[in-house]
Amino acid sequence: MADGHLTPAPLVIVASNGTGGDMQPFIALAQALQQRGRRVRLLVPGWQEAAALASGLAYRTFGTQEEGQAMLGDPGLWDERKGWGVVWRGLVPHLGAVRDVVQGLPGGEECVVLCHPFLVPMAALGRSVRPDLRIVAAYLAPSNLCSSHDFLAAGSLRIPAWVPLSWRQALWRLLHRSMVDPVLLPGLNGARAQHGLPPEAHFFAHMLAAPDASLGLFPAWFAAPQADWPPHFVQAGFPCAAPHGAAALPPELERFLGEGEPPVVFTPGTGHQHAQRYFSIALEVLRRLGRRGLFLTPHAPQVPQHLPPNVMWQAHVPFAALLPRVAAVVHHGGIGTSADAFRAGVPQLIVPFAYDQFDNGWRIKRLGVGDVLLARRLSAGRMQRQLARLLAAPEVALACGEVARRMGPGLAPAHLLDQVEAALAAA
């Protein structure tokens, strides 16, 4: 440089929203980037401030604890038709959060936003004060890429492989115009107008097109690159197990595991507060199968009050330590839980409620390591039959072993960071 000083590396604003499965990967990426010498600032919802504080990173929050609890307390959050609207209504008052951070930076300081795809509209509003703001969307799962070529499910509607491409494209258009845009566009375009930006015609089209580059945090054997994915797409793979994954199991859980056969794990996801029926059915299924069980949820009131000795409840357990010691895991289809089960080589029964869970579930079934039981069709009889088959089928055990070998120890942190840096450089 002419003045003999090096230009500082751009500040990376890492922004995410959602429950633990959405937050932890972004926090881990932010920590790793900082360890590599990048300047990093987290941007998270106020109800996730404890996670940001524990990360040791500089951070900003948007929204309040009360707003987050109101969202989690809304049963519509786990309805495939209503869920996106519940999340979006909580975000709309805070769509200017990235803009506020960018506006507060010293004049001329470079920055780039690395964000959850659902926060791309928030990041794009930052261009009202910095038109050249660079954005990288990091996709934890493939469903939000809205590919017509690899379109497995529209919510609970399974899309067979024989459906022609033109029909798949038409179905995406119908879904977006009839169910997505009427709910999400008014808030988005209201915020854009407030900040002097033109309106967008379609929500997901904006989400896919606004980033300068995109990053896929899943491997090609789970979702191969497609012709209609965004340009400048860098595909990495599943991140390694969480840093706390090697933590010891609680002593009472160690005793439980040592007292009998490997249990079946049941979890509807950390954010689910409306799973009373799910756990009641799980308890009945365990009784019918004569199996031991482990119920995982931080929300104890939804677990049956009096559990038999062969069933245990825990609020939080490190999956990397637990899952290699269980018979199977019944879960919602969250991508983090799915990857942990792949790594452990255990069968999975997916009970999807909303969001990417359906698509993840059918990909798991396609790999031969699990099955799908739609939440709206959940019954003790169906769960018993599907779980019994998964536990007994030798071909499922073989497929689980093969996928575990593909996973290996996980994507090396250095290699993952190289891919993240490549996406940041492409922006």
What are these regions (language model features)?
Residues 2-20, 24-41, 47-56, 105, ...:
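Nucleotide-activated sugar donor-binding and catalytic core shared by glycosyltransferases
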Residues 8, 221-328:
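Donor-nucleotide binding loops and adjacent catalytic segments primarily
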Residues 36-41, 133, 289-293:
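A generic structural motif
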Residues 43-45, 62, 116, 136-141, ...:
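Generic beta-sheet signal
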Residues 44-49, 117-121, 219-223, 297-303:
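Short, polar loop motifs at secondary-structure junctions
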Residues 49-50, 66-70, 141-148, 357-359:
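Short gly/pro/ser/thr-enriched loop/turn and capping motifs at secondary-structure boundaries
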Residues 58-111, 165-170, 174, 178, ...:
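Phosphate/nucleotide-donor binding subsite
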Residues 93-168, 216, 220-223:
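Conserved nucleotide-sugar donor-interacting segment of glycosyltransferase catalytic cores
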